[in-house]
Amino acid sequence: MKYHDNTSFASDSIGIDIDLKKLKFLIPEIFSPIQEIKYKFKKWGFSTHIEVISEHVKYGDSQGAIVVKTNPLLIAAYNEDIDCIVMLVFEDKIQNKYNFKIQDRLVCVNTFAEISQLQSDLIPGKNNSGMWTLVHPIIADLVSSDATKIEKRKNEIGDKGYEYIWQLATDYLKLKKGVSRIGKPIFSDQVIPQYF
C-alpha cells in the first residue's frame, strides 16, 4: 500500500473500488482540476485525496454502520478494534439523494492509527484490543457501487451484528449527546465536533 501501514492488515477487507461520481457528489472539493490531473497521473507518483480514499476502501477493515437519524443524517460507523462507534453527520443533500430510513444497514471501511491518547469522542467497548487510539471510518455505500460485495458483507454482519451497533449508537447518544464528526472522508478521522 502506498498511503497506509503495510505492517498491519485488515481482517475484513472487502476490496471495493470507488465510484468517482458518488465520491464527487459526497465531497466535490477534492475534484478540483489540478486534483483530477494528478489522479490521472498517479502512476508517476502524484498524490491525491481520491487515491488515498480509493486505497482506504479497498484495503481497510469493513464493519457495519447504521442510520441513526435522518434530520440531520447521522450514521454510526462501527469498528471492532476499539469496539465502538464513530458518529458521523452528513449534509442534507446526502439524505435527499439516498432517502435513508432510521436503522438502514450500511457498511463502513476503517483504518487505524496510534496517537498519544484515545480520540475524545470514542467510547471504547469491553472488547477493545488496545492497539489503536485513532479510527478513520468511510461509509462504503456513499463512495462505491460494488453492491454485490457490500451486500455480502452486510449479510455476514447479520442481524446480531447490526443490533449490537444500534445499541452502541443508542448509548452514544446518551453519553455524547449532540457530538458527531464530519462524515466526509477527508475529515472523518478528525475529532471536529459537529453539534446536532
Label for each model-derived stretch:
Residues I27, F31-I34, S116-P124:
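Internal, charge-rich low-complexity segments
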Residues F41-Q63:
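Short boundary/loop segments of OB/S1/cold-shock single-stranded nucleic-acid-binding domains
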Residues E55-L73, V107:
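Structural detector for short beta-strands of small beta-barrel domains
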Residues V68-E91:
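OB-fold (S1/OB) nucleic-acid-binding surfaces
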Residues K93-A113:
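Short nucleic-acid-contacting surface segments enriched for D/E, G, S/T with interspersed K/R
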Residues L118-F196:
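Cytosol-/stroma-facing membrane-proximal "stalk/adaptor" domains immediately downstream
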